Amino acid sequence: MMDTIIIRDLELFLRVGVPEDERAKPQRLLVSIEIAHDFARAVEKDDLRSSIDYAAVCQRLAEWGAGRSWCLIETLAVEIADLLLREFGATTATVEVRKFVLPQTRFVGVRVTRHANPHVS
């Protein structure tokens, strides 16, 4: 059984876009994350150290993106999911990135899901 931590609409300002002028300055993105993790041990002990600290996740993502740029939000979403698996011990990470670049739409976005590889030590 897996449990899920949900972070909805984390506001990040990152450089992303295919045209260079779009990447010239950080733009507002909303990032939503679902992190699967077994909470049984955390609940048993009522101890954050056995869970995933969602405040630490938010802080890490804010710092991680500083000074970087991406052409595709697809790449950004996959890199965030990989970071959650690698650094926070998520079993599964689903990441949705929304950007507000086309005036005729409310937003454009992508959603990716990545799973930890149980065969990697």
Q: What is the role of each PLM region?
A:
Residues 1-121:
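N-terminal, polar/charged subdomain of small-to-medium soluble alpha/beta proteins
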